[in-house]
Every structure is written in structure tokens, then in C-alpha cells.
Amino acid sequence: MIIPWQDIAPDTLENLISEFVLREGTDYGEVEISHQEKVDQIKVLLKNGEAMVVFSELHETVDIQTKARFNPNLTNHNYD
């Protein structure tokens, strides 16, 4: 289930993004960027609709997914 990022308290969203950035690894490319810059980049992706906050009912977890990686079959469990 997609959770609108605008509905999440600012501090909670900041912590969620920060945790996501830490989990995603350390691909610095040619120029190393700060943790806060990475957080800011994710905020831009959320605002542009290129990333989304997703709640997995099956796993009872919240995550940030890029639009390209989002698979709705992994977030919902259909009992039909």
C-alpha cells in the first residue's frame, strides 16, 4: 500500500528517509556527497513522484521504493 509522503509527520519522514539512505549503501560515484545531501535527493524524488513510501501488509514494514523498483505484488497479500 502506498502511503502519501505528505501524510507522514515531518520528523518521522526525515527518520524514514535517513534510514533508507543508510541502508542503500555507499555508492559515492566520482564525488562523495553528505548524508544530508542524499536525504535531500530522496525528498526531491518523493516530491516528483519518482519514489514512494510503501507499507507492506505482508511484512508489516514501511520502506521507500523508487518508481522503477516498485512491485505492488510484494506489498499486498491477496487472500482470494
Swiss-Prot record:
Residue ranges of coiled coil: none
Gene3D superfamilies reported in the protein's UniProt record: YehU-like
Pfam families: UPF0270
InterPro entries, per the entry: UPF0270, YehU-like_sf
HAMAP family per record: UPF0270
Family: Belongs to the UPF0270 family.
Protein name (Swiss-Prot/TrEMBL): UPF0270 protein VFMJ11_0205
Biological source species: Aliivibrio fischeri (strain MJ11) (Vibrio fischeri)
